Amino acid sequence: MKRLPVNEGGRGGSMVMTGIRDRVQVNIPFTWLMEGYLELFVKEGLHPEIGIDAQALDRYDDGDFQRVARIFLNRGRSVTLHAPFLDLAPGSPDPLVLSLTRKRLEQAVRLIPFFRPRTLVCHAGYDGRRYGGELRQVWLNNSLETWRRVADRIRGHGAMLVLENVYERGPEEMIDLFDALEGTGTRFCLDTGHLSAFGEAPADRWIEALGSRIGQLHLHDNRGEEDEHLALGDGVLDFPSILGQLARQLPSPPVVTLEPHREADLEPCLRLLEDIWPW
């Protein structure tokens, strides 16, 4: 088991968790925590959204996951988990691909009792270029079986399943999925960067169609062409408008995760969010 540079007990940290820093999650792959970022997250009082990918699942054992979980939970940090997604297809018409996808998701679900996360974020996985036409219903039926299993498994541990947009062109490609999952506790994770880079519908249309079902936000910016994961304000997204519209639909804030991909971009994200936070 890899040694971590942080004690498991006590509250630790170099700053008091106040303001916006205590209201948001910050994304971080589990492998990065094990390779040095754990100490920074503890020192800065950050609430993590921990990415669980194939590398983490294959490299580390239960003891590694349990120890990292204890370090955060003993310090009163809230945790969210992001399930594996690369090369996975939760609605695949290929039985072997579907089986492998469900196996990887099940491996992530097994970690829920360790981390006690608020949410488990999964990619909904629809792409009209691959699953359009007659394959749409096959994709939907397989997806529903996949997500009902996951939602049922995690609900007893107090975690909420949230499904995130990636290549979906507009909310119309997700509405029937959420309609059919009504009653499972499954909610929508609106990813602002993805709707800008890959979608065709503006943010206000997403919020109008699915705003009441939003349980989580992924906030990052881009210039409208690539999934750059820039600091908020460094791209084309109008975050004051997006959050303002959401606040008119949601009386209390959803879970909010910041997803910059450079360490230097975190503080600018926090500063902007502090200025425009509408709740």
Language-model features and meaning:
Residues 37-45, 62-80, 110-116, 152-156, ...:
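Acidic (Asp/Glu)-rich catalytic clusters
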Residues 27-31, 51-55, 84-86, 125-127, ...:
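Active-site beta-loop-alpha junctions enriched in small/polar residues
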Residues 62-67, 98, 102-105, 136-144, ...:
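Charged helix-capping and loop-helix junction motifs
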Residues 7, 91-187:
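Active-site acidic/histidine proton-transfer and metal-coordination neighborhood
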